[in-house]
């Protein structure tokens, strides 16, 4: 873990399965008070989420943050779009990468860094079905090798 990077609150394991991650960028998230309480309680889902760039600003879309149970009328919409805090040059770089290619921005994980909620955004290209099968096959082979090594070393 990098200095200051703390507790991982949510991970998007499906993203690494469905996409080739080309580049990652750390971004802050604009959250309301009850949303940050829900995030700290790990009540966040990244599975269907993605990021997009509109009018020179980055936005996180389709990320579900469950309503805070004690928040009553101050709870925000669980599916609302949330602004991502990135530097201008990072936004322009990502916007240039997204133009004309089959690239997308997916959230990979949410964690706390020095008390602030951060999201790791991945610039990703979609995998084909045969790529997914190849990844699964490679993972199974590595698992079998580890199992055999463990059995061999136990003798």
Curated annotation (Swiss-Prot):
<dbReference type="GO" id="GO:0070929">
    <property type="term" value="P:trans-translation"/>
</dbReference>
<comment type="function">
    <text>Required for rescue of stalled ribosomes mediated by trans-translation. Binds to transfer-messenger RNA (tmRNA), required for stable association of tmRNA with ribosomes. tmRNA and SmpB together mimic tRNA shape, replacing the anticodon stem-loop with SmpB. tmRNA is encoded by the ssrA gene; the 2 termini fold to resemble tRNA(Ala) and it encodes a 'tag peptide', a short internal open reading frame. During trans-translation Ala-aminoacylated tmRNA acts like a tRNA, entering the A-site of stalled ribosomes, displacing the stalled mRNA.</text>
</comment>
<keyword id="KW-0694">RNA-binding</keyword>
<keyword id="KW-0963">Cytoplasm</keyword>
<comment type="similarity">
    <text>Belongs to the SmpB family.</text>
</comment>
<dbReference type="GO" id="GO:0005829">
    <property type="term" value="C:cytosol"/>
</dbReference>
<protein>
    <recommendedName>
        <fullName>SsrA-binding protein</fullName>
    </recommendedName>
</protein>
<dbReference type="GO" id="GO:0003723">
    <property type="term" value="F:RNA binding"/>
</dbReference>
<dbReference type="InterPro" id="IPR000037">
    <property type="entry name" value="SsrA-bd_prot"/>
</dbReference>
<dbReference type="InterPro" id="IPR020081">
    <property type="entry name" value="SsrA-bd_prot_CS"/>
</dbReference>
<dbReference type="Pfam" id="PF01668">
    <property type="entry name" value="SmpB"/>
</dbReference>
<dbReference type="InterPro" id="IPR023620">
    <property type="entry name" value="SmpB"/>
</dbReference>
């Amino acid at each position: 873990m990098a200095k200051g990077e703390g507790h991982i609150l949510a991970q998007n394991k499906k993203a690494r399965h469905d996409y080739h991650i080309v580049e990652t960028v750390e971004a802050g998230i604009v959250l309301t008070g009850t949303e940050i309480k829900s995030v700290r309680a790990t009540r966040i889902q990244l599975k269907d989420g993605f990021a997009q760039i509109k009018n020179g600003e980055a936005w996180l879309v389709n990320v579900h943050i469950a309503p805070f149970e004690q928040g009553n009328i101050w709870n925000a919409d669980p599916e609302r779009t949330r602004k991502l805090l990135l530097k201008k040059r990072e936004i322009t770089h990502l916007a240039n990468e997204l133009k004309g290619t089959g690239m997308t921005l997916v959230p990979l994980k949410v964690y706390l860094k020095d008390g602030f909620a951060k999201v790791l955004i991945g610039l990703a290209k979609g995998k084909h079905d045969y790529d997914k099968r190849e990844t699964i096959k490679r993972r199974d082979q590595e698992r079998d090798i580890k199992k055999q090594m463990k059995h061999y070393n136990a003798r």
